[in-house]
Amino acid sequence: MTLKELVVGFGTQVRSLWMIGLHAFAKRETKMYPEEPVYLPPRYRGRIVLTRDPDGAERCVACNLCAVACPVGCISLQKAETEDGRWYPEFFRINFSRCIFCGMCEEACPTTALQLTPDFEMGEFRRQDLVYEKEDLLISGPGKYPDYNFYRMAGMAIDGKAKGEAENEAKPIDVKGLLP
């Protein structure tokens, strides 16, 4: 080993230590996730939830449109009916290990029962734990649309009253009378 090689080797060691010293106290680009919350865009599509009406009843009417719209087929449900004729899902199941969070189920839902939230912390150790049942999906609030009530907007037959006679219900419009 010559003196020149020794000086070059020593110089590279000093240069390396100098570069480490420069970058050791610089501002870090890496965000420390649990301590610093991650910025999520306003329209971020995360975990799917089932919401309730402002009255507290389930919004889902088990129309099966969400399951049909799902491109990967991860939604399954079974329709049941109450004594007053209202439909509800007897069971509602989403397999999040197959879900691609595309949001097509939310767009297809006529009652805004299915909504995508900005929650993304869904990691599990076992694949079976990613199958969510209705009890896991149902939240206590109305979600993004707090004032929307499907049965008030769409109407539902009430025993003993004709269309347009119920409280907060508009009179029916004769659409054929609107033609020129």
From Swiss-Prot:
Enzyme class name: translocase
Species assigned in the record: Edwardsiella ictaluri (strain 93-146)
A Pfam family the protein falls into: Fer4_7
Protein localization: Cell inner membrane
Family: Belongs to the complex I 23 kDa subunit family.
Protein's GO biological process: aerobic respiration
Keyword annotations from UniProtKB, A to Z: 4Fe-4S, Cell inner membrane, Cell membrane, Iron, Iron-sulfur, Membrane, Metal-binding, NAD, Quinone, Repeat, Translocase, Ubiquinone
Record's protein name: NADH-quinone oxidoreductase subunit I
